[in-house]
């Protein structure tokens, strides 16, 4: 990996990326309301479970396959698999989340003119667009490899979940850093598992997350949009 590719992925994983990630907790706030999260240890366990049991089986391998589609510019597969992922979201708010963040990242890619004109036209044609599809486009535009792309995406997800826990539980900054450090190895394992997952084995089935997310839509007091 070149320094330029590394910096591009650090940019994509940064919480400063203007796609609205900070406003979503992806079920963490509902888990807190259901008393599944009570403190730093239970927050760490919840985030670890989301990484190893949900992302590693679904979102990360999907991202890897979409990266390959962008690299070969397989427009038919890109559109079909993007539509499948959007339809697979477990609740209305999780669907809105991936659509809003995907749209925001796609707009950023277009505004910064990342990628060639033909691929930018394909990107613009995908509506709604899932976040992993847009993230894969941005990574492909910077010639990033699959392993580094998935690691950046997973780290960004862990960091955002930890940030949500800091606000909602609440936790202190040191507790948040301990969670991130504790999950470094889990990120590596999730990436390796995702890279070994063929397209027909991508699995987004997450019933507990779906139920919690649906409950969150009518939760009395909320900080986050999911």
Curated annotation (Swiss-Prot):
What is its subcellular localisation?
Cytoplasm
Q: Which InterPro entries match?
A: UreF, UreF_sf
Q: Where is the signal peptide?
A: none
Q: Which GO terms describe its molecular function?
A: nickel cation binding
Q: What is its main location?
A: cytoplasm
Q: Which domain of life is it from?
A: Bacteria
Please tell me one Gene Ontology term that the record gives under cellular component. cytoplasm
The record's annotation in Pfam families points to: UreF
* Subunit record text: UreD, UreF and UreG form a complex that acts as a GTP-hydrolysis-dependent molecular chaperone, activating the urease apoprotein by helping to assemble the nickel containing metallocenter of UreC. The UreE protein probably delivers the nickel.
Q: Which family does it belong to?
A: Belongs to the UreF family.
- Report what the protein is called: Urease accessory protein UreF
Report the source organism. Burkholderia cenocepacia (strain HI2424)
State the taxonomy lineage. Bacteria, Pseudomonadati, Pseudomonadota, Betaproteobacteria, Burkholderiales
């Amino acid at each position: 990996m070149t320094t330029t590719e590394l910096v591009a992925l650090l940019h994509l994983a940064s919480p400063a990326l203007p796609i609205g990630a900070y406003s979503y907790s992806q079920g963490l706030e509902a888990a807190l309301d259901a008393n599944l999260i009570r403190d730093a240890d239970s927050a760490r366990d919840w985030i670890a479970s989301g990484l190893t049991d949900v992302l590693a089986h679904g979102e990360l391998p999907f991202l890897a396959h979409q990266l390959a589609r962008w690299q070969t510019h397989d427009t038919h597969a890109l559109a079909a698999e993007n539509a499948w992922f959007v339809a697979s979201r477990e609740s209305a708010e999780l669907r809105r989340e991936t659509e809003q963040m995907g749209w925001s990242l796609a707009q950023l890619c277009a505004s910064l003119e990342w990628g060639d004109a033909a691929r930018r036209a394909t990107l613009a044609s995908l509506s709604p667009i899932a976040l992993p599809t847009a993230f894969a486009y941005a990574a492909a535009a910077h010639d990033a490899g699959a392993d580094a792309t998935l690691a950046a995406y997973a780290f960004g997800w862990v960091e955002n979940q930890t940030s949500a826990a800091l606000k909602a539980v609440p936790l202190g900054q040191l507790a948040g850093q301990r969670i991130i450090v504790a999950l470094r190895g889990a990120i590596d394992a999730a990436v390796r598992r995702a890279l070994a997952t063929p397209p027909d084995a991508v699995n987004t089935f997450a019933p507990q997350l779906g139920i919690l997310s649906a409950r969150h839509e009518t939760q009395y007091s909320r900080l986050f949009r999911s």
